[in-house]
């Protein structure tokens, strides 16, 4: 089991990531990264690179801590980040309807005591039921899709449109718990 021996800094303002770390029983503080989030590549390359940038930006401001940064995106026929409008959310949801897609999260941890850097990615496959235009309009009207990659939250009302997942549920929420635990243990072993 991971024993927290130094401060943990979450380089994200995501309420979902905060909730996941709290559920894991970890003490942490938040320092939101201001890293450039423009990058092109495969979905896995994108989430790994963006999580690294976020962690590096925050690591410069903290010594004696572990920095944890993450980046999540949804990939169907195209990369889906957070929608910029209700219309874009509708388009994303229509594209996900009655189909499989992948959710990728890249996690980077930097131990500023040793300079150790770990970056890992997780993929979860998600299947949506067939959604009607009315389903999509009603869901978008709740506002829930507007701050989430792929325009849905599996842990909220968006969960009613998902009939199957293959992989980590917490990855779809925004932070894969088992992966985070393993990375923390790996950093802890490196300190012994």
Identify the role of each PLM range.
Residues 15, 35, 114:
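Short, glycine/serine-rich, charged loops/turns that create anion-binding
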């Amino acid at each position: 089991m991971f024993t927290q021996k130094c401060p943990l800094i979450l380089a994200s303002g995501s309420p979902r990531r905060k909730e996941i770390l709290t559920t894991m029983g970890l003490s942490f503080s938040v320092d939101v990264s201001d890293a450039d989030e423009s990058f092109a590549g495969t979905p896995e390359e994108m989430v790994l690179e963006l999580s690294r940038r976020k962690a590096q930006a925050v690591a410069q401001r903290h010594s004696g801590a572990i920095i944890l940064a993450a980046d999540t995106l949804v990939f169907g026929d195209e990369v889906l980040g957070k929608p910029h409008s209700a219309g874009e959310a509708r388009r994303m949801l229509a594209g996900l309807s009655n189909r499989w897609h992948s959710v990728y999260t890249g996690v980077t941890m930097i131990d500023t005591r040793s300079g150790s850097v770990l970056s890992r990615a997780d993929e979860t496959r998600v299947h949506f039921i067939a959604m009607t235009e009315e389903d999509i309009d009603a869901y978008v009207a709740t506002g829930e899709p507007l701050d989430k990659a792929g325009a849905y939250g599996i842990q909220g009302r968006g969960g009613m449109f998902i009939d199957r997942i293959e992989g980590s549920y917490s990855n779809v929420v925004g932070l894969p718990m088992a992966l985070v635990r393993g990375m923390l243990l790996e950093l802890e072993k490196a300190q012994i």
